[in-house]
């Protein structure tokens, strides 16, 4: 009885792993679209990242530190400071 259970488990595992080794047609189609190396860098479109100029003044306006955060942002960029204008946009001084 013990050897029968071991044989049954072994056959089940073998069947499971045999089924996993067969590649599906969808995976083969995805691999055909794969581009490798330098050619990939030339063909891949760059990701678009939005620039949110109002993040410093808008997000921190409720805490009361919006002008300080804008000034710190401008100092990190190498300017003499900055302020938040009426449209909640950080304006850096030269």
Swiss-Prot record:
Induction section of the entry: By injury to the larval cell wall.
Name assigned to this protein: Sapecin
Subcellular localization: Secreted
Keyword field contains Plastid: no
Tissues/organs with expression: Hemocytes and fat body.
Biological process according to GO: defense response to Gram-positive bacterium; humoral immune response; innate immune response
A cellular-component GO term for this protein: extracellular space
Family: Belongs to the invertebrate defensin family. Type 1 subfamily.
Species this chain originates from: Sarcophaga peregrina
CDD domains linked to this entry: DEFL_defensin-like
């Amino acid at each position: 009885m013990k050897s029968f259970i071991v044989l049954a488990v072994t056959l089940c595992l073998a069947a499971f792993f045999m089924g996993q080794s067969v590649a599906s047609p969808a995976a083969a189609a995805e691999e055909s679209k794969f581009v490798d190396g330098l050619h990939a860098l030339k063909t891949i479109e760059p990701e678009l990242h939005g620039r949110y100029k109002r993040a410093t003044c808008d997000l921190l306006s409720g805490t009361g530190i919006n002008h300080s955060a804008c000034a710190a942002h401008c100092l990190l960029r190498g300017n003499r400071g900055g302020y938040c204008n009426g449209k909640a946009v950080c304006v850096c001084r030269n």
